[in-house]
Amino acid sequence: MKPLAYRMRPTKIEDIIGQQHLVAEDKIIGRMVQAKHLSSMILYGPPGIGKTSIATAIAGSTSIAFRKLNAVINNKKDMEIVAQEAKMSGQVILILDEVHRLDKGKQDFLLPYLENGMIILIGATTANPYHAINPAIRSRTQIFELEPLTPELIKQALERALHDEHRGLGTYSVSIDDQAMEHFAHGCGGDVRSALNALELAVLSTKESADGEIHITLETAEECLQKKSFSHDKDGDAHYDVLSAFQKSIRGSDANAALHYLARLIEAGDLESIARRLLVIAYEDIGLASPQAGPRVLNAIQTAERVGFPEARIPLANAVIELCLSPKSNSAILAIDEALADIRAGKIGDVPKHLKDAHYKGAQELGRGIDYKYPHNYDNGWVEQQYLPDPLKNKQYYKPKQTGKFESALKQVYDKLMKRK
């Protein structure tokens, strides 16, 4: 017998749980099905939310024949068979799993069929199609993002399976404690496939009572779904979403949010990404407002790397809280980015002659190094002279902020020097 998650796959668009922003009657996919006019599309979202099942349900809601292939497993010959069927029948829906893994040869073969509409592609992927899918394919498809399933929607899927006598567990007399149901719904981490298969394991592995009832307790549920599933693909879209939220929470001084995202990265065992991002934050977002934050973060990272997980969470948490509650300044990154923008725009100019290297024979004959004023020979180690090239001689890249004691002190010095020019 096939697993419960497979048996409970929706066959019609009305059976789809969740994704109402796409499949409801008044939403885009719902309207396409009602109008009997499907366009090629890419469905993307996290693992276990039913992308391929939804694709099958969409195709099954039409009168058009459909075929399922996998971009990795199936070869070009398999696609040629689908194309031949499309030529004979006029149109075929191709459900293509892992569409982001489509190689160039298969892409080139599919493109003309997508162009003339003989093949309607419904691709499924966990990867962000804007990053992972060839632009030629993207331009011929609609891209729809599927939303993670909430615990309430997971419970809806479980209840449906418990009462379905044909495909589900409806032929069994099952009672399930509320706490057990909550564990399945929350413990699967949004993966309905995992929740359904855990429920089936619980039902099939639990002995009937004297009255023929199968009673599922929290203990049984925890045994069948032992660890809270946490989906975190280090190369996936969600990984960069978490890192982005992590940095933005620290930048926004929200220690609680930052600790939440840190915990997600820790749970994924992603020490390398945490370390890199914390160092970037220390210099990009804290910057000159508290320059000692950088070395302290580095020390925390080195400690974390030395002790490893689970203890690594302690120095990392210390560093995150300090960064959250430190004064913030991005004056340095703004300054260097403005300087780089000038360089890339061709605003360069020649190095002033008095600053050019004069440590070789004949340099003075070329006018190099002449009239250079050595600052250490002057009061307070400063003397007025031009350092920037002529086209930029009055340019000010650095614009100090006063969000920390250190940069406030730097600003006083900087302002004083600017006035003396």
Swiss-Prot record:
InterPro entries: AAA+_ATPase, AAA_assoc_2, AAA_ATPase_RarA/MGS1/WRNIP1, DNA_pol3_clamp-load_cplx_C, MgsA_C, P-loop_NTPase, RuvB-like_N. Its main location: cytoplasm. This is Replication-associated recombination protein A. Disruption phenotype: Full RecA induction does not occur in response to DNA damaging agents; RecA 'threads' do not form in response to H(2)O(2) treatment. Increased sensitivity to DNA damaging agents H(2)O(2) and mitomycin C. Double dnaB temperature-sensitive-rarA deletion strains die at 42 degrees Celsius. Double dnaC temperature-sensitive-rarA deletion strains are very growth impaired at 42 degrees Celsius. Double dnaD temperature-sensitive-rarA deletion strains grow less well at 39 degrees Celsius. No changes in sensitivity to DNA damaging agents methyl methanesulfonate (MMS) or 4-nitroquinolone-1-oxide (4NQO). It is an enzyme of class 3 (hydrolase). The keyword ATP-binding applies. The lineage of its organism: Bacteria, Bacillati, Bacillota, Bacilli, Bacillales. The keyword Electron transport does not apply. It comes from Bacillus subtilis (strain 168). ATP binds at G45, P46, P47, G48, I49, G50, K51, T52. It is found in: Cytoplasm, Nucleoid. SMART domains: AAA. It comes from the Bacteria. The gene is rarA. ssDNA-dependent ATP hydrolysis is stimulated by single-stranded binding protein SsbA but not by SsbB; in the presence of SsbB, ssDNA secondary structure is removed and RarA's ATPase activity is decreased. The C-terminal 9 residues of SsbA are sufficient to stimulate ATPase activity.
